[in-house]
Amino acid sequence: AFGHLFSRQLALVEHLGFVPKQSEDERDAMLVRLEYACQTNDFRKPSGAPLLDLAMAMKEHPLSLLGPSEMQPVLIRFKNQLNENSGRFARIGVVPEMNHNELVAWGGVSDDADPAREDQATLFLTWDGLQKRVSSRIDWMIEHMPTDYAWRIHGEGTSLLEVLLHHCIVMDWLTIALAFLHGKDPAAIRPIQALKAYLADEASV
């Protein structure tokens, strides 16, 4: 569903001129690179072993997702995929805004911090196009993170669009791996189905 909806929305915003339109060669090259990312992050293959190791390290910890404002769409999607695929809660923080408040709860240079901060599994979503000051903020946070469970996931690509899609591929494999580690079918969405059935019954009254 994601690919079906996204491709049509992308075609529309390109047609309206909201984002630069890619040439056929650029689009084809991007799709080749994204297909490679899809294949190499498959945790059923040897190349996907690092992703599976990451999922195993995340399994027993509360999850935090942090990144710059331009990564906010994939931060939200990542949280949603963890909720739906893995049956896990996750929260997101956007840099630099979270540096003005949430940073206090992380501590790192002070004891005035959340008691559970050291148990957080934290993923930083980054890319080559990070604004310099934002990059410095993230580097400072990584250096002062009070948890041993912190990783940087770097989006690959020659454009922001490609980087966002690359992050989506990695998060899909990661949340599916985490689902299996928890013994959950990543396609199982019984609470959503139950809610829809309840609303349908209520509407028919």
What annotation goes with each model-predicted range?
Residues 1-205:
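A SIS-like phosphosugar-recognition module
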